[in-house]
Design a protein with these regions (language model features):
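Periplasmic OmpA-like peptidoglycan-binding domain that tethers envelope proteins to the cell wall
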Residues: 32-45, 50, 68-148, 153-154
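Extracellular/lumenal/periplasmic "stalk" regions immediately C-terminal to a signal peptide or transmembrane helix
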Residues: 1-19, 24
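Structural motif
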Residues: 22, 62, 130-132
């Protein structure tokens, strides 16, 4: 999979990290959205058009699309807070991944607003890095040990 993503990684359109034992594909706001918007840019659509089939090829794997913002408040009619903005962005990305071949029953969306910064929000650069979409490859629960044999301790 990393080989398939290499050109997008090399061009700065996405990064891949391991977070809490999960592979996370990170897409910066600058590639996907205009500031304060959940409408995907043309470049973002192109990146997702390339990424969707790669994710779809991972048979049986599930993905969580997480929307993240910086700590600067937003107060618009459509987005009363960063929670709504981050959720709308995650949903828009998830819906487009479905259009590009990822089965809808393998995608979930989550809004994180400004609760999981990767950089300090004290600088413009840090805030820019915190405005992102993360696509986390969920662990395959069928590969986890069977815990049904354990009885509740009472």
């Amino acid at each position: 999979m990393l080989k398939q993503l290499k050109s997008m990684i090399d061009s700065g359109k996405l990064t891949v990290r391991i977070v809490r034992n999960k592979m996370v594909i990170e897409l910066p706001e600058a590639v996907l959205f205009a500031s304060g918007s959940a409408k995907l840019k043309t470049e973002g659509i192109r990146v997702l058009a390339e990424l969707g089939p790669v994710l779809a090829s991972l048979k049986g794997r599930e993905f969580q699309v997480g929307g993240h913002t910086d700590n600067k408040p937003i107060h618009t009619k459509r987005f009363p807070s960063n929670w709504e903005l981050s959720g709308a962005r995650a949903i828009d990305v998830g819906e487009l991944l479905i259009e590009y071949g990822v089965p809808g029953n393998r995608i979930s969306a989550a809004a994180y607003a400004d609760t999981q910064p990767t950089e300090s929000n004290e600088t413009k650069e840090g805030r820019a890095k915190n405005r992102r979409i993360e696509i986390a490859l969920q662990p395959n629960l069928d590969e986890l040990p069977d815990l049904s044999s354990f009885e509740d301790a009472e």
